[in-house]
């Protein structure tokens, strides 16, 4: 089994380690590959879209990689997006300060995301968060977005003051926090429930 990590920016190594730890825990071997070009998507069983600065990631991909990624996910490739990854997966994105962003997105999930919802770096925080089907995890929110509205096929796995830190829709899981910094429980759930099914 091959799991890809979009490797343009963000906690790439931490996601790779969380996937390896999860596969050991589940009792199977996984090859983790870094995805930097459309051709790297071939033969994947799932993909992680890490956090980072969303407009920078889009520019680094030249859009071409993201469009190929979108096609793969629409064709059933299981995907997990954290922080900026959740922004890319949303059908609607706004910014806390400027409103409409016009930034490139994949537009896959029935949800509205507000970038930098909690403010700047100094407003970053950690908390224990209960995720349906996963349990309690230590959630790290770093310049985090917030999912403020869901509709259609999107379902919340948790709620936080009127926002949804974890949302699932079909083969996609979006998280506004960074699970890779504290636990592999979320990655394990992703592998078990979305990749192996």
From Swiss-Prot:
Disulfide bonds: none annotated. L-glutamine binds at residues 52-54, 115, 142-143. Pathway: Cofactor biosynthesis; pyridoxal 5'-phosphate biosynthesis. It comes from the Archaea. GO terms for cellular component: cytosol; glutaminase complex. Keywords: Glutamine amidotransferase, Hydrolase, Lyase, Pyridoxal phosphate. The keyword Lyase applies. SUPFAM superfamilies: Class I glutamine amidotransferase-like (SSF52317). One of its GO terms (molecular function) is glutaminase activity. It catalyses: aldehydo-D-ribose 5-phosphate + D-glyceraldehyde 3-phosphate + L-glutamine = pyridoxal 5'-phosphate + L-glutamate + phosphate + 3 H2O + H(+); L-glutamine + H2O = L-glutamate + NH4(+). One of its GO terms (biological process) is glutamine catabolic process. The keyword Hydrolase applies. Its EC number is 4.3.3.6, 3.5.1.2. The active site is at 83 (nucleophile), 178 (charge relay system), 180 (charge relay system). InterPro entries: Class_I_gatase-like (IPR029062), PdxT/SNO (IPR002161), PdxT/SNO_CS (IPR021196). NCBIfam families: PLP_synth_Pdx2 (TIGR03800). Catalyzes the hydrolysis of glutamine to glutamate and ammonia as part of the biosynthesis of pyridoxal 5'-phosphate. The resulting ammonia molecule is channeled to the active site of PdxS. In the presence of PdxS, forms a dodecamer of heterodimers. Only shows activity in the heterodimer. Belongs to the glutaminase PdxT/SNO family. This is Pyridoxal 5'-phosphate synthase subunit PdxT. The lineage of its organism: Archaea, Thermoproteota, Candidatus Korarchaeia, Candidatus Korarchaeales, Candidatus Korarchaeaceae. The gene is pdxT.
């Amino acid at each position: 089994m091959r799991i890809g990590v979009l490797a343009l920016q963000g906690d790439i190594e931490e996601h790779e380690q969380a996937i390896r730890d999860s596969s050991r825990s589940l009792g199977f071997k996984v090859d983790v590959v870094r995805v930097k070009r459309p051709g790297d998507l071939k033969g994947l069983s799932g993909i992680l879209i890490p956090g980072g600065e969303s407009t920078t990631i889009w520019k680094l991909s030249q859009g071409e990689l993201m469009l190929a990624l979108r096609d793969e996910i629409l064709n059933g490739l299981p995907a997990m997006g954290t922080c900026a990854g959740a922004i890319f997966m949303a059908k609607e994105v706004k910014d806390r300060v400027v409103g409409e962003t016009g930034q490139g997105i994949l537009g896959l999930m029935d949800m509205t995301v507000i970038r930098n919802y909690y403010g700047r770096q100094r407003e970053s925080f950690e908390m224990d968060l209960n995720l349906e089907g996963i349990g309690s995890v230590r959630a790290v929110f770093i310049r985090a977005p917030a999912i403020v509205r869901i509709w259609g096929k999107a379902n919340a796995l948790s709620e936080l003051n009127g926002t949804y830190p974890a949302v699932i829709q079909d083969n996609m899981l979006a998280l506004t926090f960074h699970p890779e910094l504290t636990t592999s429980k979320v990655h394990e759930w992703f592998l078990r429930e979305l990749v192996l099914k």
